[in-house]
Amino acid sequence: MKKIVLFLGSVLLLASCDVKDPIYNTPHPNHGIVMGLTEWSQRGEGVEVPAEYLVEVSGTTNTANATATATATTTANATTFTMPGLFEPGNVEVLAYNLLAGVSANGGIATVSTGTDGTLLVPDAGVLFSGVATVHVVADDTARVTLAMQQRMREVRFTLTITDGAPERITDIKARLDGVAASINLRTGEVIGNSASVMLSFLRKGDKLSANVWIIGIIEEAKQQIVTTLTFSDNHRIETTTDVTDIFHNFNADKLTPLSITGSLYAPVGTKPDGTIIDWKPGNGDGGDVDTNM
């Protein structure tokens, strides 16, 4: 009888040794975390990688033992990032972008702010980028994603040469470009919204007038035109409006290559010159350099 009891006890002891606690790989066995890498090769020559950028992950998050459908956001200053919080298993969208002064973002749409004169503000420094990808979150694991960041702005360079007349008579030049876009979809790169205008700040050095501006694109359905006002030393002003839609044909297709527009300007010697002294010529429309007459 004692032998039977001892035998049964041994069997129970051995059986209990086979019951083990589950072994997990992470402290979050029912959820996953999201880590990522940003890749910045798609940028124009001389364009720097932003010092910091925002990352949003849309999905079911788990923070402080509460689950909810929300967007987790973090600020990163390196090419790698780790999102805060935990995520339910399943697909989540990861969206990264950098914010510039005068540019806001809401719901994946970036919008350039408007100044007091009704024209778009031009960011003082930096270029807008964004990248998006979908990653599958697995419980008890880390989901890793690589975001190919895309340049979302393009530079326009205006260079005018005063070829005849009296350059010193030009005391001021004001110009604006109409038909540009104010908003862009950070996921797709599509420009949206109504047509807007941006000021062109020309500076004169000797016989050269130059202006550079960064824009997120043009509204293809709108007319692109340049409105220019020249002021001379006798306070006489000449304003012209010229259609330059052909010059900006396919402008949105290549954000990495600046659009360079060159031209010539005649500064009349006499007072109150007659005729139109600004005469923009249509460009070649292929996104390359454009030669105009002014």
Report each predicted region and the residues it spans.
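Positively charged n-region of N-terminal signal peptides that target proteins for export
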Residues: 1-4, 19
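C-terminal motif of bacterial Sec signal peptides marking the signal peptidase cleavage site
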Residues: 13-16
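Structured interaction patches on ligand/partner-binding surfaces of diverse proteins
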Residues: 19-20, 71-73, 101-144, 235-266
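A short, Gly/Thr-enriched small/hydrophobic beta-strand-prone motif that recurs across taxa
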Residues: 21-43, 150-163
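A short beta-turn/strand-edge loop motif at beta-sheet boundaries
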Residues: 43-51, 164-171
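Tryptophan-paired
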Residues: 51-110, 169-250
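A sequence/structural signal for flexible, mid-protein segments enriched
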Residues: 123-209
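Short, low-complexity, Pro/Ser/Thr/Gly-rich segments in the mature regions of secreted, periplasmic
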Residues: 200-203, 213, 275-294
